[in-house]
């Protein structure tokens, strides 16, 4: 992530807080106004606020279904054009709700907010974040509502960051603006030792390290996207995982934590999105592995374990 920002915006007398809300948090009118009240209360407490929002509920899946009704082989570029629409709906509705509550807000698409990416359609990576527009809106004492998950590449084409990309968008903004806090709101109250929706008697963790969270995310824990944790670790952005439905203390994700109880195991995760590929008759000669993994990389396939 190349900042290239010049002077970073920061009002000395106000904290800057980045808040991210997932699709379930804005899935209908009641949830949208619930989020709007959380954001408005944060702003009214004397903070500058940037909000990053995902597409509503199952919108992304619904858009994928609509594409499949047209063609079974859509181009990645056109899929990004389609999928980016989900977040644009969310940011507009949330900005309307905030304005309805008397909290002045401006919605920005990913490209309006300054996200620049590479050309890997549907799985793009952020290359630069130009924050001038966000900063100018904050200077006007407005809440800035940003569409997560999306950006613009060098061809001026819309790109998306892949599943969980809104988490990455939020962390990138927090890093670029040197935010005081980066809060990730979900439908659970923090990071648990296992998924509380599937396992009984789980325990919520008050703190967890970036490395531990990254391991859980890589193994299938759906609280945070693993790319967002990688970015948070790189720029040392502390994350706070909270519930948008229950105002209780959540889990802080940071570089170092005090392990008072000496827990041997912090958490258990299950990953069902895994495929096993067996390659037979591989020649034992230099360069073979490079060719194989090069082909996988071209298709944006991550290799987790080699046996």
PLM feature spans:
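Flexible, glycine/charged-enriched surface loops at secondary-structure junctions
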Residues: 47-51, 224-227, 238-244, 248, ...
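A broadly conserved detector of short glycine/acidic/proline-rich loop/turn motifs that flank catalytic sites
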Residues: 149-150, 188, 243-245, 257, ...
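A conserved regulatory-domain signal marking ACT and ACT-like small-molecule sensing domains
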Residues: 250-307
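Acidic-aromatic/histidine active-site loop/patch
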Residues: 232
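Single conserved hydrophobic/aromatic residue that forms the stacking wall/gate
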Residues: 1-12
């Amino acid at each position: 992530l190349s900042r290239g920002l010049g002077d970073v915006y920061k009002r000395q007398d106000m904290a800057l807080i980045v808040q991210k809300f997932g699709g379930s948090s804005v899935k209908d009118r009641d949830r949208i106004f619930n989020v709007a009240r959380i954001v408005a209360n944060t702003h009214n407490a004397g903070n500058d606020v940037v909000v990053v929002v995902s597409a509503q509920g199952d919108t992304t899946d619904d858009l994928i279904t609509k594409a499949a009704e047209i063609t079974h082989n859509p181009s990645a570029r056109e899929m990004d054009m389609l999928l980016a629409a989900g977040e644009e709906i969310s940011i507009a509705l949330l900005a309307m709700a905030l304005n309805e509550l008397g909290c002045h807000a401006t919605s920005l698409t990913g490209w309006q907010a300054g996200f620049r990416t590479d050309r890997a359609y549907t799985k793009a990576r952020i290359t630069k974040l130009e924050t001038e527009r966000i900063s100018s809106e904050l200077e006007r004492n407005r809440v800035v509502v940003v569409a997560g998950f999306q950006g613009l590449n060098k061809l001026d084409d819309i790109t998306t960051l892949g599943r969980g990309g809104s988490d990455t968008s939020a962390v990138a903004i927090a890093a670029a603006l040197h935010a005081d806090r980066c809060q990730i709101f979900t439908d659970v109250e923090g990071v648990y030792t296992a998924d509380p929706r599937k396992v009984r008697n789980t325990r919520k963790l008050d703190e967890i390290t970036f490395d531990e969270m990254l391991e859980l995310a890589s193994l299938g824990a759906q609280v945070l996207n693993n790319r967002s944790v990688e970015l948070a670790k790189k720029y040392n952005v502390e994350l706070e995982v909270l519930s948008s439905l229950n105002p209780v203390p959540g889990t802080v994700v940071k570089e170092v934590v005090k392990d008072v109880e000496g827990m041997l195991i912090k958490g258990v995760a299950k990953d069902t999105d895994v495929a096993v590929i067996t390659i037979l008759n591989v020649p034992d000669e230099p360069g073979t592995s490079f060719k194989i993994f090069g082909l996988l990389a071209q298709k944006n396939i991550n290799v987790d374990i080699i046996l």
